[in-house]
Swiss-Prot record:
Disulphide-bridged cysteine pairs: 480-512
Species per Swiss-Prot/TrEMBL record: Spodoptera frugiperda
Name this protein carries in UniProt: Mannosyl-oligosaccharide alpha-1,2-mannosidase IA
Residue ranges that the UniProt entry lists as topological domain Lumenal: 52-670
GO cellular component: endoplasmic reticulum; Golgi apparatus; Golgi membrane
């Protein structure tokens, strides 16, 4: 029948043209298409089940949720960058950009941002987290290792390693309802006004933490006005989470358990210092990271913190490879290369190499690795044996030759915390480190004789020396820690120097308060001078800044604990009110460019030490004396509390190594 059906053929200029369309594929083409689709399906399914997020989860639903959490942690800026505010882009003004409404934010963007924030809060509110005092096992998985530590990761304090046999918690007696050590800042029935002040500081911590989490999570610090990460901080752009590590023990002490847990989990999963390929300050990394991690280990017993502290300590060891054992200032954890600051020439800084002793000694005691103690003991020996001009220590020393640089001496910048750590090393050792105490008292007698000055109106201050002479009649804000230092020294002596130390402590703390009281913002400048024209006031523009510093509040806290004079609490509350009025912004807390302006401009940096130190000391001053008692705890220069050996069973010293010897030590022995 087909033979009689008509056929049709197209012709162009009489030439037949073949048809270019078919209604079906040839059999071979069908097989090829099916094969491609089948291969694609197999690859897709394989990828689905071998992604790290899916391998570490028990169910597909959990895996999807984990992926969602990863996106969430990236922060709202990933999905919706914040709008330009105040006609600014970054640090540079932009002319002619119009914004709607107050503050320069587009109302549509504000509505979208509020919806996103509400969604994040709703999702975070769904979490049910255990109190960290009872269980600090990680709640997130990591592709780098097991998702949970062994059951015995939480260690009870080894009372046998300490002279004291009593139950001691961060707040004093061990809570009856728990076999862990729980922090309680105020006893039941406390004064409602004091409780209100304590809660105010806690809310400040939450405001600082929440905005860091929202705009800079995992980065080092926050720009609270720009609402983005601060990439030019002391730790640069590397994702070390400096604010997280620095603020963790403050969260714990304030009882902010959910926030502590999320910070703890970030450290467990993301803090890998050996991946950082940039120069880090040995000093800053030690006091903030090693110090912060060891403090959390002492408070909680979570061995993750101890192990991370050892990891960071190991990364710093190559900086000590010098002819004298005095470390270089900077270390690249990835390449292991170390160097000095360009501005310091061949020299290391006294306050940096001399402010490692607490952290490295304690790290040796809790890990059983003696190498850390060996490094700082070598520094101590060099500084003890070297010739000291007038019994004081110049700020610069060459680690290759062991010779002093410029004969510039200070209890402020470049020198301050070296002297602080001589006293605190003796305190933390339970009085066993006699060398440190002798070095401290000898240096302080020289400092009081040569640096202590009194202004025409009677204000005491610590000036700076160069070649034995006063070079400037000024005092740094950094020196304001000295009031607390001299007070601690006074209460631990039983001789004629004790009374003099306490007298100096009161006078210096009063002077630092005057530098606050004489500014329009009631916050203190970076440095202040003394002359007939003006006293306790800054004169140069770069001295008029306030960087959210804690040193004055540290002295308020210690002076309150040791004297019980109400004015120290009153001064602290004045500072809280000033911080809330001038430094608080929608995106956190900012430093100030000029403390003498009634409406000062912000510097747009929320320093990590604002959470670690400033807020911690302001919180502690309104707490009970049994909350971190000073006869059982000593604070490192970043306000991380360390237990005192022989007086606090949370010291957790071990008799033998609990971690393998670091590779650097093995290589040096070879």
């Amino acid at each position: 029948m087909t033979g009689i059906l008509p056929t049709y053929q197209r012709f162009v200029n009489g030439v037949p043209v073949p048809s270019i369309s078919r209604r079906s594929f040839r059999l071979r083409e069908k097989y090829l298409i099916v094969s491609v689709l089948l291969t694609f399906g197999i690859v897709w399914l394989g990828a689905l089940f071998y992604l790290p997020e899916f391998k570490s989860s028990n169910s597909v639903n959990d895996s999807v949720y984990n992926v969602y959490k990863r996106i969430q942690k990236a922060g709202p800026e990933l999905l919706m960058p914040p709008p330009l505010a105040q006609n600014d882009v970054g640090d540079f003004p932009v002319i002619g950009i119009a914004h709607h409404g107050e503050g320069g934010d587009d109302p549509h963007v504000i509505e979208d941002r509020n919806r996103l924030r509400a969604k994040i809060e709703e999702d975070m509110g769904m979490k049910v987290l255990e109190r960290p005092q009872f269980d600090v096992a990680p709640s997130v998985s990591s592709s780098r290792g097991p998702s949970k530590p062994p059951v015995d990761a939480i260690e009870e304090p080894a009372v046998g390693n300490n002279a004291a046999n009593k139950d001691v918690s961060p707040s004093g007696p061990k809570a009856e309802s728990s076999d862990k050590f729980v922090a309680v800042a105020l006893a039941p029935g406390a004064d409602p006004e004091i409780k209100h002040k304590l809660e105010t500081v806690k809310k400040m911590m939450l405001h600082a933490w929440y905005n860091y989490k929202l705009y800079a999570w995992g980065k080092n610090e926050l720009k609270p006005m720009s609402k983005r990460a601060h990439l030019s901080s002391v730790f640069g752009a590397g994702e070390l989470g400096a604010t997280i590590v620095d603020g963790l023990d403050t969260l714990y002490l304030m009882g902010l358990n959910d926030e502590f847990r999320e910070g703890r989990d970030w450290v467990a999963e993301h803090l890998h210092i050996n991946e950082i390929d940039s120069d880090l300050s040995v000093f800053e990394t030690t006091i903030r990271f090693v110090g912060g991690l060891l403090s959390c280990y002492a408070l909680t017993g979570d061995t993750m913190f101890r192990d991370k502290a050892a990891e960071v300590g190991d990364a710093l060891l190559p900086a000590f490879d010098t002819p004298t054992g005095l470390p270089y200032a900077l270390i690249n954890p990835s390449t292991k290369a170390s160097r000095q600051y360009h501005w310091a020439g061949p020299n290391s800084i006294l306050s940096e190499l001399g402010t490692l002793h607490l952290e490295f000694t304690y790290l040796s005691d809790v890990t059983g690795r003696d190498i850390y103690r060996q490094k700082v003991s070598r520094i101590r020996e060099v500084l003890d044996q070297i010739d000291k001009p007038g019994d004081l220590y110049p700020n610069f020393i060459n680690p290759r030759t062991g010779q002093w640089g410029q004969r510039h001496m200070s209890l402020g910048a470049l020198g301050d915390s070296f002297y602080e750590y001589l006293l605190k090393a003796w305190l933390m050792s339970g009085g066993a480190d006699e060398q440190a105490r002798i070095m401290f008292d000898t240096a302080m007698q020289a400092a009081l004789d040569k640096m202590l000055r009194v202004s025409p109106s009677g204000l005491a201050y610590l000036a700076e020396l160069k070649y034995g002479r006063i070079i400037e009649e000024k005092m740094d804000h950094l020196s304001c820690f000295a009031g607390g230092m001299f007070a601690l020294a006074s209460t631990t002596l039983d001789n004629s120097m004790s009374e003099r130390y306490m007298d100096v402590a009161k006078k210096l703390t009063n002077t630092c308060h005057e530098s606050y009281a004489r500014s329009e913002t009631k916050l203190g400048p970076e440095a202040f001078r003394f002359s007939n024209a003006a006293e306790a006031r800054a004169q140069k523009s770069n001295e008029k800044v306030y960087l959210l510093r804690p040193e004055t509040f540290e002295s308020y806290f210690i002076m309150w604990r040791l004297t019980k004079q109400q004015m120290y609490r009153d001064w602290a509350w004045e500072a809280v009110q000033a911080l809330e009025k001038h430094c608080r912004v929608e995106g956190g807390y900012t430093g100030l460019v000029n403390v003498y302006h009634a409406n000062p401009q912000g510097d747009d940096v929320q320093q990590s030490f604002f959470l670690a130190e400033t807020l911690k000391y302001l919180y502690l001053i309104f707490g009970d004396d049994s909350f971190l008692p000073l006869d059982e705890w000593v604070f490192n220069t970043e306000a991380h509390p360390f237990p005192i050996r022989g007086k606090n069973p949370l010291y957790r010293a071990v008799d033998k190594p609990v971690l393998p010897e670091p590779a650097h030590a093995q290589n040096n022995r070879i």
